[in-house]
Amino acid sequence: AVDIEYDFPFGFKELEGIHSRTDYDLKRHQEFSGKKMLYFDPDIQDSYIPYVVETSVGLDRTFLAVLSYGYTEETLSDGSTRVVLKIPDFLAPIKVAILPLVKKDGMNDYALNIFNDLKKYYLCQYDEKDSIGRRYRRQDAIGTPYCITVDGQTLEDNTVTIRERDSMLQDRIPVDNIRKYLHDKLNVI
């Protein structure tokens, strides 16, 4: 028997067990069922009871390993702590969040239009509660790779800010280019 283990924050735990059962299980099944468990190998022109390798893997611990690996606490220049779930884009439950800077002057309506377009292509979330900084932090903590911010400049020139989760870098792009931008950036299956 061999175990594949992962070093969790609370110590090494098994992710998968691999056991060589040889031909024991099939021989016992053959003995008690009366059914032949033979395999005919055309290359050697002979029949035999094959060996079995039994593997057991749990999705719960595997997923916990992904979350443990991705969970990060960063100290920012202002001394605050940022919790980030740095998981691959294809595992992120939400791919992009659409955030109006404020809930007035038509920014929320503009943002909802973007949300309604993007939700056809990506798992999206619309959020207008709290300050933009708190909304960014919420999205960082759940692993959302990109946040789109609709602000006053958006209403003037039809551009938005797209913020990347891991680096916090921001790009200003035309609204018409959002889908292409996300398609090029997101590593989704």
Give the location of each predicted region.
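NTP/phosphate- and nucleic-acid-binding module
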Residues: 1-189
